[in-house]
From Swiss-Prot:
Pfam families listed in its UniProt record: KH_2, Ribosomal_S3_C
Domain of life: Bacteria
UniProt keyword Calcium, yes or no: no
Protein name per UniProt: Small ribosomal subunit protein uS3
Cellular component annotations (GO), alphabetically ordered: cytosolic small ribosomal subunit
Name of the gene: rpsC
Taxonomic classification: Bacteria, Pseudomonadati, Thermodesulfobacteriota, Desulfovibrionia, Desulfovibrionales
This protein's record includes keyword rRNA-binding: yes
Primary role: Binds the lower part of the 30S subunit head. Binds mRNA in the 70S ribosome, positioning it for translation.
GO MF terms held by the record: mRNA binding; rRNA binding; structural constituent of ribosome
Family listed: Belongs to the universal ribosomal protein uS3 family.
One example of a Gene Ontology biological process annotation: translation
Keywords, in A-Z order: Ribonucleoprotein, Ribosomal protein, RNA-binding, rRNA-binding
Length: 213
């Protein structure tokens, strides 16, 4: 059976950048594990802030977090109260100095991670999975996505046997390296069990000058 490679790992160094940017020889395993814990911790604290991506940079003993969010006001808070609280929580939890940068996502309708989380939240509210998929697909196409594919896997509509349903609109060329493919994954925790949601959004081609030559 054909398997699908992760769209980010497939394009790293070509048209996608690493989400953890640092170098270490002796502490490499510890840093990888700590990065995972930092992301889980921040995601849990900012669950309702529309957080799409957490990039981590390290220099010396300091850690720099770049948060991409659809709702920067919730992350920063009035007069920066919330972001300062987050910085203090991170310092207490991990014992390091953190600097935080917040980037706003202008079009959350074509951000694959936010789209996947939106579908998962609808499934948790008992919205029919086909309706949730079609609604988000039409919104993504309306806001400039050239193609989108959504899959939902699990006990859909409370069925006895788990299955996978998918819906696609437009082109989603997963094997084309120059294609700008955004990928997101989320889990919906329903009374019947966990339903996995995957989203691929095609935003057009990235034409590299060296590749063209």
């Amino acid at each position: 059976m054909g398997q699908k490679v992760h769209p980010f790992g497939f394009r790293l160094g070509y048209n996608k950048n690493w989400q953890s940017r640092w170098f270490s020889k002796k502490e490499y395993p510890a840093f990888v594990y700590e990065d995972s814990k930092i992301r889980a911790f921040v995601k849990k604290l900012l669950y309702h802030a529309g957080l799409s991506k957490i990039e981590i940079e390290r220099a010396g003993g300091k850690v720099r977090l770049i948060l991409s969010t659809a709702r920067p006001g919730i992350v920063i808070g009035r007069k920066g109260v919330e972001i300062e609280k987050l910085r203090n929580d991170l310092r207490q939890k991990f014992g390091r100095e953190f600097s935080l940068e917040v980037n706003e996502i202008r079009r959350p309708e074509v951000d694959a991670q936010l789209v996947a989380e939106n579908i998962a939240q609808q499934l948790e509210r008992r919205v029919a999975f086909r309706r949730a998929m079609k609604r988000t697909v039409s919104m993504a196409r309306k806001f400039g996505g050239e193609g989108i594919k959504v899959t939902c896997s699990g006990r859909l509509a409370g069925a006895e046997i788990a299955r996978t349903e998918w819906y696609r609109d437009g082109r989603v060329p997963l094997q084309t390296l120059r294609a700008d493919i955004d990928y997101g994954f989320a889990e919906a925790r329903t009374t019947y069990g966990i339903i996995g949601v995957k989203v691929w959004i095609y935003k057009g081609e990235i034409l590299d000058k060296e590749v063209d030559q």
